[in-house]
Amino acid sequence: MEHLTLIPAWMLIPFAVMLLCIAVLPLIPHVGEWWEHNLHKLYVSLLLGTPVAIWMIANKMDHELIHQVVFDYIPFILLLMALFVTTGGICIRGDLKATPLTNTIILGIGWALASFMGTTGAAMLLIRLLIHTIQQRRYRVHTILFFIAIVANCGGLLSPLGDPPLFLLFQKGTPFAWWMQNMVGEWLVTGALLLIVYYIVDSYIYHHKEPTENLMADIREAGKLQMSGLINIFWLLCVIAATMFINKTYIPIMGEEHAAWYIKLLREWTFILIILGSWVTTKKQVRVDNNYSWTPIMEVACVFLGIFVTMAPALEFLRQNPLPITEAWQFVYCTGTLSAFLDNAPTAMVFHATASTLPIDAATAVAGIAPEFMKAISMGAVFFGALTYIGNGPNFMVKSIAEQEGINMPSFFGYMIKFSLIVLLPIYIIVQLIFI
């Protein structure tokens, strides 16, 4: 960077206010109803993001701003949109008996798929099936919360396709199979503990709290599985292939400093073509049967625009004022804590840069950092994204779809107090103590 601008601490205020808006506005009477409209979320994002953008341009940080919006936000949204549109065109219909075992199996399948089709892809593929399965149950919220943790986050640890921070670490030079070779233990133990806890919780609710009439309706209305829109399996594979192969590793010109912007965004152009292809080749009735709506992805786009812009000075502030951490366990919790409130992909990059300043053994280094730091950063970025609704893109989408289907989801703070801090965090601490 030719011109170094020191970020004052007060430039973190817009980002903090953005987070507070997401957390608090839905709880305020009347204001909560106003906040429900995506256009109003966009207004808030623009209100907070525009002054930040003006300040960055005035202080010769336009390069950082452009990079944050064009090369971070747009690819982030287009990848999520490509996965949302393709998986939203695969309709898995059926109302299975919503027993604890059935629900646990659905969660387990999503957990296994997440590393290979992305947490967003797996979540969007299975969330509607899960909601249809549990629709006769009175107590449904806990199932959606565990779905967010297991499928939309923790399942994506085994490959760069699983979660954006791992893809960026892959771009930094981590071998594609490194996570599969080195982090299966963390993936297995975390997933197994979450599935076991869910099965115990759902079994208790099923046998002791569910009204008999709800259980009888669930049995009476159960039906067989049916799938339609299978052309979207092809389009989903195209998304996976584009994510894996259309990058500067395989197309070096994309990484050249003076390459045209449209060359650098070649993967994103491909995503747009895939979105159009999926939309055109999918029968309209399939999406109707799937209760398809643009609302969830539009909510993510509007909210995360404000997050990405106001987050730019916050990330630069962290780069200029690195945290004094030197131990692997510290990287787990520092990366994890910030990933819960910042986007986990750029957060992983910040801590990769921090780790790269520490002494390493060149013979064992992974992407320029010690292997134990790579494991810690990966675990913190992927797992801790489940601690809040904004920690990972799919969280908001799952929440929005569930609310569209009449499930009353917890507030921002309610999610943390009633679920993530008392269920997820203890499990993460156990896994960290075992492996890192």
Regions found by a protein language model. Name each.
Residues 1-11, 33-43, 63-75, 176-186, ...:
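Interfacial loop-to-helix junctions that mark the boundaries of transmembrane helices
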Residues 1-11, 15-21, 25-29, 46-51, ...:
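Intrinsically disordered, low-complexity non-transmembrane regions of multi-pass membrane transporters
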Residues 11-22, 37-54, 73-83, 108, ...:
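Hydrophobic mid-bilayer segments of alpha-helices in multi-pass membrane transport proteins
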Residues 30-31, 52-70, 84-98, 112-125, ...:
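Transmembrane alpha-helix boundary signature
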Residues 114, 124-138, 143-147, 151, ...:
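Membrane-interfacial helix-loop connectors
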Residues 139, 158-159, 168, 177-221, ...:
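Juxtamembrane and boundary regions of transmembrane helices in multi-pass small-molecule transporters
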Residues 179-281, 421, 432:
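Core mid-bundle transmembrane helix pairs that form the ion/substrate translocation pathway
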Residues 235-358:
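Transmembrane helical segments that form the transport core of multi-pass membrane transport proteins
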